[in-house]
Amino acid sequence: MTSKPNTPLLDQVVFPSDLRKIEDKDMPQVARELRDEMIDAVSVTGGHLGAGLGVVELTLAIHKVFNTPEDRLIFDVGHQCYPHKILTGRRERIRTLRQEHGLSGFTKRAESEYDPFGAAHSSTSISAGLGMAVAAELGQTDRKVIAVIGDGAMSAGMAFEALNNAGALDARLIVILNDNDMSIAPPTGAMSAYLARLASGRTYMGMREIGKKLTAYLGKNIDRAITRAVEHARGYVTGGTMFEEMGFYHIGPIDGHSFDHLLPVLRNVRDNAKGPVLIHVVTQKGKGYAPAEAAADKYHGVNTFDVITGTQAKAKPNAPSYTAVFADALVEEARLDDKIVGITAAMPSGTGLDKLQNLFPERTFDVGIAEQHAVTFAAGLAAEGYKPFCALYSTFLQRGYDQVVHDVAIQGLPVRFPIDRAGFVGADGPTHAGSFDTGFLASLPGFVVMAAADEAELKHMVRTAAAYDEGPISFRYPRGEGVGVQMPERGEILPIGKGRIIKEGSKVALLSFGTRLAECLVAAEDLDAAGLPTTVADARFAKPLDLDLIRQLARHHAVLITVEEGAVGGFGSQVLHMLANEGLLDHGLKVRSLVLPDLWMDQAKPDVMYEKAGLDAKGIVSTVFTALSRDALAQDSLA
């Protein structure tokens, strides 16, 4: 284990107010020390390293120039917030990042006054910032609002909706576009920096104000002519952009790793901006750490690693991951059916669709961070006879729900939805938990909703979805490894709406939807030992329910427990509704529904989170005993 880095200047900075006492000439050293501290911390915890390394100078410059937390600083997504946390009173806890009882991996309002708006999903910063900027104007304060958004997040429609509204409102909002893929335009050295300083200065920014005053004096009829004249003059210096068309004063691109470029531009904007300003800053993801700079993903998300070599610690898997099983099964089906296409919203490796992309690039579509578009794009493909697999994380499917309802479900289009990261996801906490998809999909008429109990079942569900053309169909599966079951050579086509009984009993029935099946089997052993012969069933489907299976369990057992990795309103609610409507609750059946708790659970290891939620074997046994009013001592005997 290496010693912590030597950081004499950074040691003087507890809060941004301390940073403002440091001379400009010493800022590059502070940046080096901050980068070293961040690398060392993430080597211990794992996390999102590359994005933070890319914004070290930018984060320092913003906190030095602006009066945070009075001035509001909002980071989009939040992957890049680790340097910000170190500078805002949280350095002593930085090695608890993403750990149980530790710092969140994202900005979080409850954690610090320097986090005015929480984030984790993309493209929200400009909308939130605009709300805060308008609030400042309504409150007649001089508060500045700065939103930092990456070029990737700009692919989402919400970002452009906010830009359009901000321009129309002429709000005092500063948007910093962090272009870390050089996908928009590279800076052009000293001349670019000079022009950016010039464009952000009082003279050129004043031209816009002159235009506004002339419009007010002479009337709106000549508004467009004045605007064209002002922007034409500015165009000789800065070049016209779409941002200017939306009403923003555009500065840049500038070098996001140069304090000589950043500090004067930010100071000019702070002192002179009267309306919306967009500063285009070019940075390098992974900057300053050779292994990250050399890696294809720039160390976007890493496990713990050796600081010297960059080698990441990866435990040898006991079974293939669910994501890998899905990817391999989809490739297998795609080889046999040229109508199968894959769609991802900027997550090809996370969803496993990169495997399909490598083999069938013409049939794989990465639409960017645009889940709404992804869903309706898939609907269009389905309408023309193709078989789209729109692979999204559960938490991101939420972003396209209206499209699922309006464009897919109402029209009965056979879009396939592989839903990754179902249930608790561990270190990423509540913003990334897959809690709600079962509830919001099972409520839609004509939707088939499945959950895989293990990796073999997942393979069956991929083939089932590929073969199903009657309407939309989904199947959910968690992050992480499978349970190590024997894998079929190819998946089977499952009968729609039919579950299976895994183990027969007579007193207690455990009906599982998803991967809690393994815990149900462990619980059944304990219940059998306690004299409660237990049936274990795998529902497979939340919609349509296996009515015959549920009737059988209800009529021949004293207790029926539904178990799922989702929020209330999902599978268990569907079962209870069916039981009530058929009168199966009228004769003494004790039914309990185990779901994710009705609260936002902070990050921890998934096993710990499920234990706290009562969704492990012990929690299931406890629920059965409580339902039967058994003596608590019996529970202790099974511990």
From Swiss-Prot:
UniProt-recorded Gene Ontology molecular function terms: 1-deoxy-D-xylulose-5-phosphate synthase activity; magnesium ion binding; thiamine pyrophosphate binding
Highest taxon, organism lineage: Bacteria
Reactions performed catalytically: D-glyceraldehyde 3-phosphate + pyruvate + H(+) = 1-deoxy-D-xylulose 5-phosphate + CO2
Requisite cofactors: Mg(2+); thiamine diphosphate
NCBIfam families linked: dxs, PRK05444.2-2
SUPFAM superfamilies: Thiamin diphosphate-binding fold (THDP-binding), TK C-terminal domain-like
Name used for this protein in its record: 1-deoxy-D-xylulose-5-phosphate synthase
Matching SMART domains: Transket_pyr
Residues binding thiamine diphosphate, per UniProt: H79, A120, H121, S122, G152, A153, N180, Y289, E371
Function per UniProt: Catalyzes the acyloin condensation reaction between C atoms 2 and 3 of pyruvate and glyceraldehyde 3-phosphate to yield 1-deoxy-D-xylulose-5-phosphate (DXP).
HAMAP family xrefs: DXP_synth (MF_00315)
Keywords, sorted A to Z: Isoprene biosynthesis, Magnesium, Metal-binding, Thiamine biosynthesis, Thiamine pyrophosphate, Transferase
Pathway(s): Metabolic intermediate biosynthesis; 1-deoxy-D-xylulose 5-phosphate biosynthesis; 1-deoxy-D-xylulose 5-phosphate from D-glyceraldehyde 3-phosphate and pyruvate: step 1/1
Cofactor note: Binds 1 Mg(2+) ion per subunit. Binds 1 thiamine pyrophosphate per subunit.
GO biological process, one term: terpenoid biosynthetic process
CDD domains: TPP_DXS, TPP_PYR_DXS_TK_like
Lineage, highest ranks first: Bacteria, Pseudomonadati, Pseudomonadota, Alphaproteobacteria, Hyphomicrobiales
Family: Belongs to the transketolase family. DXPS subfamily.
EC main group: transferase
EC numbers, comma separated: 2.2.1.7
